[in-house]
Amino acid sequence: RVKYRKVFPNQPFEVLEMDIKFVWVEEYKMHCYVLTTIDTFTRIVLHWMVAYSIKKQDVKRAWEHIIINHLQPNNCLEKGINIEVRNDNDSRFSAKLIQEFFKENYLNQVFTHPYTPQENGHIESFHAILAKKLCPFTFWSIDELEGVLTLFYEKYNNERLHS
């Protein structure tokens, strides 16, 4: 469980947060899931994906991507960065497969307390920004949603000022 309600990381990759957002798609009259992982120090989105179904194996693949493309190139292990991964109690995050994968890769998974979005505040805030951006749209297909998300994430990571 989370020790501190708010996080104050001192460097990139110290505290990472992940969460899943739901977005309605008309094609099959159902929600799509958007999985996002953010670095709380830089506010950069390290990985995102959208699908009609996200399973624990998808979460693992997302973290394999983060490790290969972000953590390893920045020598996080060699630098001795104690990486904390904050997430809620979603069954995909609490699955034994994910917990073991995190341990094997020196990632310290921390679960937020129920009904305390402030403990995962950066990703919750990010998903609120995303919701506001997506609000005016009606998505007819997952491809249409993915196109809008691709532009949004690129602009968010590359054009906005990160505090």
Predicted regions and their residues:
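Mobile-element integrase/transposase regions
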Residues: 1-38, 44, 57-65, 69-74
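Residues immediately flanking
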Residues: 20, 40, 89, 158
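Hydrophobic (often cysteine-bearing) scaffold residues that line and stabilize catalytic clefts
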Residues: 34, 55, 59, 86, ...
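Hydrophobic alpha-helical segments, especially N-terminal targeting/anchoring helices
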Residues: 38-39, 117
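Short hydrophobic alpha-helix segments
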Residues: 48-49
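Acidic/histidine-rich, metal-coordinating catalytic segments
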Residues: 63, 75-94, 117-120
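Surface-exposed helix-capping loop/turn segments at secondary-structure junctions
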Residues: 71-78, 159-163
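Charged alpha-helix within mobile-element recombinases
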Residues: 98-110, 115-163
